[in-house]
Curated annotation (Swiss-Prot):
InterPro entries: BTB/POZ_dom, Ion_trans_dom, K_chnl_volt-dep_Kv, K_chnl_volt-dep_Kv4, K_chnl_volt-dep_Kv4.2, K_chnl_volt-dep_Kv4_C, Shal-type_N, SKP1/BTB/POZ_sf
Protein name: A-type voltage-gated potassium channel KCND2
Description of its domains: The transmembrane segment S4 functions as a voltage-sensor and is characterized by a series of positively charged amino acids at every third position. Channel opening and closing is effected by a conformation change that affects the position and orientation of the voltage-sensor paddle formed by S3 and S4 within the membrane. A transmembrane electric field that is positive inside would push the positively charged S4 segment outwards, thereby opening the pore, while a field that is negative inside would pull the S4 segment inwards and close the pore.
Region (Required for dendritic targeting): 474-489
Modification after translation, per record: Phosphorylation in response to MAPK activation is increased in stimulated dendrites. Interaction with KCNIP2 and DPP6 propomtes phosphorylation by PKA at Ser-552. Phosphorylation at Ser-552 has no effect on interaction with KCNIP3, but is required for the regulation of channel activity by KCNIP3. Phosphorylation at Ser-552 leads to KCND2 internalization. Phosphorylated by MAPK in response to signaling via the metabotropic glutamate receptor GRM5. Phosphorylation at Ser-616 is required for the down-regulation of neuronal A-type currents in response to signaling via GRM5.
GO cellular component: anchoring junction; caveola; dendritic spine; neuronal cell body membrane; perikaryon; plasma membrane; plasma membrane raft; postsynaptic membrane
Function: Voltage-gated potassium channel that mediates transmembrane potassium transport in excitable membranes, primarily in the brain, but also in rodent heart. Mediates the major part of the dendritic A-type current I(SA) in brain neurons. This current is activated at membrane potentials that are below the threshold for action potentials.
Cytoplasmic topological domain residue ranges: 1-184, 250-256, 308-321, 404-630
Further information: The transient neuronal A-type potassium current called I(SA) is triggered at membrane potentials that are below the threshold for action potentials. It inactivates rapidly and recovers rapidly from inactivation. It regulates the firing of action potentials and plays a role in synaptic integration and plasticity. Potassium channels containing KCND2 account for about 80% of the neuronal A-type potassium current. In contrast, the potassium channel responsible for the cardiac I(to) current differs between species; it is mediated by KCND2 in rodents. Is specifically and reversibly inhibited by the scorpion toxin Ts8 (AC P69940).
Binding site for Zn(2+): H105, C111, C132, C133
Intervals of motif PDZ-binding: 627-630
Pfam families: BTB_2 (PF02214), DUF3399 (PF11879), Ion_trans (PF00520), Shal-type (PF11601)
Amino acid sequence: MAAGVAAWLPFARAAAIGWMPVASGPMPAPPRQERKRTQDALIVLNVSGTRFQTWQDTLERYPDTLLGSSERDFFYHPETQQYFFDRDPDIFRHILNFYRTGKLHYPRHECISAYDEELAFFGLIPEIIGDCCYEEYKDRRRENAERLQDDADTDNTGESALPTMTARQRVWRAFENPHTSTMALVFYYVTGFFIAVSVIANVVETVPCGSSPGHIKELPCGERYAVAFFCLDTACVMIFTVEYLLRLAAAPSRYRFVRSVMSIIDVVAILPYYIGLVMTDNEDVSGAFVTLRVFRVFRIFKFSRHSQGLRILGYTLKSCASELGFLLFSLTMAIIIFATVMFYAEKGSSASKFTSIPAAFWYTIVTMTTLGYGDMVPKTIAGKIFGSICSLSGVLVIALPVPVIVSNFSRIYHQNQRADKRRAQKKARLARIRAAKTGSANAYMQSKRNGLLSNQLQSSEDEQAFVSKSGSSFETQHHHLLHCLEKTTNHEFVDEQVFEESCMEVATGNRPSSHSPSLSSQQGVTSTCCSRRHKKTFRIPNANVSGSHRGSVQELSTIQIRCVERTPLSNSRSSLNAKMEECVKLNCEQPYVTTAIISIPTPPVTTPEGDDRPESPEYSGGNIVRVSAL
């Protein structure tokens, strides 16, 4: 070991000064230190085809997670000796790095919902995300939650929910989303018009309109045309009252609606009118009445229901409540500090207007907000110095929260823009689907009128095949099975109605049809998948059938009917071979299935004939089993 180090020492010194000496002989092998890992093993993690390798000790650092516990054995494949996870390999890189470094990072280019799903799958909580990424993660998560909430509200007020809505829900939906119906849109514009009229009237009634007869002093328009303004105010208040009562009646939660900000604004907007009706016109209450009339200006906030920009501003102020609280707290501290300093700095001046600390509040507020009315100015040198410091500190204190408020406003604005775009795309997509359905139906009806469907059926065989395709699949399979049995056995299966018609033709002396009544001879029957078996003819006497067609029907010997929870029934030979009208009707109303075993007597010596139909007009001598549907 020492010899190896001594051999490497000249090369290490040469590398330290930037050059390498020429070796006279081959360099010795570097010293190796065997790494002993008795309990640690190399684990291969296959994530959707991407292989990751790490040590078992690395994963077991966090035993409360999926990879660090024994639960990962559920994903082990003995054939490949790998742990297979059908997850996103890009996000898994950051999860595996958490096991290696102990720090979890949030990839900015990944979807926040997919990232949360991966963390939940592997048993990691978002609170362990590093400080470098946690704030951005919270912002993205909040935006996603708001977007999902907007989508849920849109789906709840969508057109698809109209058939299941009650009248109360329809009214509330019309108020919240006026574009759902024509009447809601008309009421929306009517209320907006009366809000504008009310605000304009509240402003115009204070404008001087000249003096009335008998008065020298000019009167405001509200007093000179009191009747006109009263009627106008009454009409506006009636509209606002009806709107408020309808909203209150249709609100999903009346308690939450009454406590909402917009509900309070509506009450404050209409309450002064009703109080003014019951108040007497005297000097004692005139001051209170004037104070109540001031609250009519709050009607302008009703425009927030009609303006998306005002709603975005309200959402911005609500989301920036913490920043605004910090701004207010900082201004309050600065105002108190600088007002106290300015009072004591100007206390020695006789011409100073800083008579008290509360009186100095006005100067501090005006200075920190950079207004500078000039009604109060410092006279001493110390007062001017502290006034300059107060002005500079005001700029810094006010400017700090402004970027946060602007960024929140921009975020909420773009979020609403995306929501409007998604709603427009969804509406256009539904319109295209509706148009496609209508166009397809119209095209089908037009082609049917033009006879395009009938022209496709060029022959009777094609028409029969078309009818058979449109029939029941069960019936088609049933005929196919009987057809295969007819081909592979020496029996012919005849439809019950065809068999009775053939018997009636023979009984009346008419010449039966030349073709066989079996299913194989009928048109429209599909080809069988089984090969034909050589058929043999049996002649068996039948006492219950007329002599003209006695040899065409095989006699049934006995039938055993096994019923569920009943004793087996046996029918006689005569009843089995009786005519259809003499048979007892089957009871098909029972809830159980009846199993019937038909035994056919052993045929006598066979008389081989041709494989095809016989030349005689009678039916073939093959065994004909009459099949009925149970």
